Design a protein with these regions (language model features):
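Short, structured protein-protein interaction patches enriched in aromatics and acidic/basic residues
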Residues: 197-211
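One-carbon transfer enzymes
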Residues: 1-194, 233-244, 249
Length: 251
């Protein structure tokens, strides 16, 4: 069970697909009691497979991860790729081992990141790529003929946890226009709000905001101009205008 459990449940019911919705203990017991050859496919969940399951000779586990491992192991990798202004990002299918996102790579797919992409739009693109990659590799996985690539742990980055956010969720007015754009788009998970609302400080007051707009245009104002008016904060810098709206004073 995970944050997407309601969506998955509705999808299964709509398409008449049998499903089980189990808590962690029940799921672990289910896996431990399996005695036939089993392939477990892990997609977008928080469940960490214990060694008691991974050590069973009849069980293999593959996992979909939203990054080009060994970059960005852990949670919300798409946000970090955007925030860090990566030019290329992608997905990985890999075997599961005890160390999070450290198993041998089965396949990867990549795409170029544009200055318009958000975490939400990247997730949608990843879903399509992950399915296409799965179709390509599933036969090899079942036949155990995959030519895997072992990860280079010298290139492995620190694990990102679910509570971590780009710059702790705070917009920094000292950033360049490119950095502001990257931050806004990284925090943007649309209706999912995976990282919560971003915020900024203005005149000693903390504001959260739920909407933004990025406009690329020639500006006659000095770089770094800030204006708070009609519940909107406008930032003009380096021929970009950032409009932050639906502001509310944070507690």
């Amino acid at each position: 069970r995970n944050d997407n459990s309601a969506f998955a449940k509705n999808f299964c019911e709509k398409n008449r697909i049998d499903y089980l919705q189990l808590d962690k203990e029940a799921l672990t017991n289910l896996f431990l009691n399996l005695d036939t050859a089993t392939l477990i496919i892990s997609v977008s969940n928080r469940y960490l497979f214990p060694s008691s399951i991974l050590s069973k000779s009849n069980i293999r586990v593959i996992n979909y991860h939203g990054a080009l491992l060994p970059k960005y192991p852990g949670r919300n990798a798409e946000a970090w790729a955007i925030f860090n202004n990566d030019k290329v990002a992608g997905i990985t299918w890999h075997y599961v081992v005890e160390v999070v996102d450290a198993g041998a790579i089965i396949t990867q797919k990549s795409l170029a990141l544009t200055s318009k992409v958000t975490s939400f739009s990247l997730l949608r693109a990843y879903s399509k790529m992950a399915f296409e990659a799965f179709v390509e590799i599933i036969d090899q996985v079942l036949l155990q003929t995959v030519d895997v690539i072992h990860q280079n742990f010298n290139e492995r980055q620190a694990i990102k946890y679910s509570w971590q956010k780009p710059n702790d969720g705070q917009l920094d007015f000292n950033w360049s226009s490119e950095e502001i754009s990257a931050f806004l788009r990284a925090m943007d998970y649309g209706p999912l709000q995976v990282l919560g609302l971003p915020y900024f400080y203005f005149e000693d007051e903390k504001y959260e905001f739920s909407k933004y707009k990025i406009v690329e245009e020639l500006t006659t104002l000095d770089n770094g101009t800030l204006a708070l008016l009609n519940n909107e904060l406008v930032i003009e810098r380096n021929n970009f205008k950032f409009i932050l709206s639906e502001l509310k004073v944070a507690e």
